[in-house]
Amino acid sequence: MTEFNIGKMHMSDNWIEACPAGKVDEEDVIRFDHGGRTFAIYRSPDDGYFATDGLCTHERVHLADGLVMDNVIECPKHNGRFNYKTGEAMGAPVCVNLKTYPVKVEAGKVLVQLG
């Protein structure tokens, strides 16, 4: 697991620098902590970047320790699965969706809008 705690503010609309874009491998997830909260940053097979809350909605385990494949993150504790693009819970044991956040890449940096 890679963990970042950069957290630089960009512009006035709450875009936060999460990590360098090159630090997230294709079909992988990293942890990002900011302001006492934790998030998960994903890179899809088509080179898109996505962000969700970092903890599984079932038992609060960090998703950055999970398995990513085909736009799905699987929780490392009980194998609950979420679509990380939409946050949709994909069956038992998870039944509550993940919160998702807008993401963009500028100047080689992944920015997440938390506001």
Question: Can you describe what each PLM-predicted range is?
Answer:
Residues 2-34:
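Zn-dependent metallo-beta-lactamase
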Residues 24-115:
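Rieske [2Fe-2S] iron-sulfur-binding domain
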